[in-house]
């Protein structure tokens, strides 16, 4: 009974918050609000050619305090950027927004009731494999040697880091 009452109170609070948030977005007429950096604002810095090897850690929903702890433990030059998420806020859209997209941006289809994201000739950006295929095509060079991938879990288990100039950690 107590749990049910707590759930009802929480639902009411979250519902009011969601309504106010939707009102804000509606009033602004765009996202993110003026003066707030969006995911697209760091895109060029993420994927620009570096003078030396570079790693980009792409993670979903990492709290800023935890991101700072990770940054403190990394060696070498580290930059940490916090940006407003995309709308909608789920993983497929947020991760695709960080890719080196063409100027016209991604194309989104809701055919069959499920989101499908594509950019240029690459579809499936809503999946990790689709995002990897896109990055290989956009940054990998003729044989894909310009970019390597490693999963964060495997990296934490001491899997070797690819020798490529750009390493993307998912």
Feature roles, as predicted:
Residues 1-54, 61-170:
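…; additionally, a secondary subgroup of soluble metalloenzymes is captured
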């Amino acid at each position: 009974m107590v749990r049910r009452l707590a759930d009802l109170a929480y639902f009411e609070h979250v519902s009011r918050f969601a309504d106010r948030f939707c009102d804000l977005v509606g009033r602004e007429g765009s996202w993110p609000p003026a003066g707030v950096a969006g995911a697209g604002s760091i895109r060029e810095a993420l994927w620009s050619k570096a003078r030396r090897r570079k790693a980009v850690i792409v993670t979903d929903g990492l709290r800023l305090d935890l991101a700072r702890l990770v940054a403190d433990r990394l060696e070498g030059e580290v930059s940490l950027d916090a940006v407003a998420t995309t709308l909608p806020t789920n993983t497929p859209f947020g991760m695709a927004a960080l890719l080196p997209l063409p100027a016209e941006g991604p194309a989104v289809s809701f055919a069959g009731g499920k989101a499908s994201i594509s950019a240029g000739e690459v579809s499936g950006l809503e999946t990790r494999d689709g995002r990897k295929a896109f990055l290989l095509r956009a940054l990998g060079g003729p044989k894909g040697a310009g970019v390597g991938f490693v999963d964060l879990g495997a990296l934490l288990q001491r899997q070797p880091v690819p020798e490529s100039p750009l390493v993307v950690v998912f």
